[in-house]
A protein has these predicted regions:
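Domain-length accessory/inserted modules outside core catalytic folds
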Residues: 1-115, 119-202
Length: 202
């Protein structure tokens, strides 16, 4: 068992991490984008030690080195949770998004930001030995690119709107698992089930 898998790692609280990023001066970096970007990197095969992770975050987001130890720990916790959840046999990978009590429009926007981060992180990471994505994997990336544009009306809070967003969110979660499954060796991944067509959110 690897060090990453020896203990269970949970994602940090979204709002707490958001506040830490603001304190570091990363005013435009949201936890959703950070998580999506790192998930894309890991899905493409990247692995980091603590120093390398912090350096990669600074490079990817063009920010100054973290001054706060809590911010450094939070970033490492995000990475460790991503890696552990991707490798878990129960498909327990989670998206780092605002809590469900936030307005639907904010949650939808954050989902689009997450997808944008994932695509950027995946595209920046050189794929060595992955053999390329399958047709399904390539279609999944195109679907994520469409979901980047997701939006809802500011007053959209109905049950149908909520159900639609949750359906899209679940598709994105399973899409990330599929892409990780295709780009990583069998002993470093859990087999991800095939994903279906993404639903449309109005």
């Amino acid at each position: 068992m690897t060090e990453e898998q020896s203990t269970s790692v949970e994602l940090p609280d979204f709002d707490v991490l958001a506040d830490l990023l603001v304190e570091e001066g990363a005013l435009t970096l949201s936890p959703a984008e950070l998580h999506g970007m790192l998930a894309g990197q890991v899905a493409a095969g990247a692995r980091f030690d603590p120093a390398g992770l912090l350096q990669r975050i600074q490079t990817l987001f063009d920010i100054e080195p973290f001054r706060n130890e809590a911010a450094r720990r939070g970033a490492m916790q995000v990475y460790m949770a991503i890696l552990q959840q991707f490798q878990a046999p129960d498909f327990s990978f989670e998206l780092m998004l605002p809590d469900d009590d936030q307005p639907l429009s904010i949650r939808a926007e954050s989902l689009g930001v997450w997808c944008s981060g994932f695509l950027s992180g995946f595209g920046m990471q050189e794929q060595t030995g992955s053999g390329g994505l399958s047709v399904e994997g390539q279609e999944t990336l195109r679907d994520l690119a469409q979901i980047v544009q997701i939006s809802t009306e500011a007053d959209a809070e109905g049950d149908e709107d909520e159900a639609n967003l949750m359906e899209v969110q679940e598709y994105v979660r399973m899409a990330a698992l599929l892409i990780f499954s295709e780009c990583n060796e069998p002993d470093a991944k859990a087999e991800a089930p095939a994903s279906g067509e993404p639903p449309i959110l109005h």
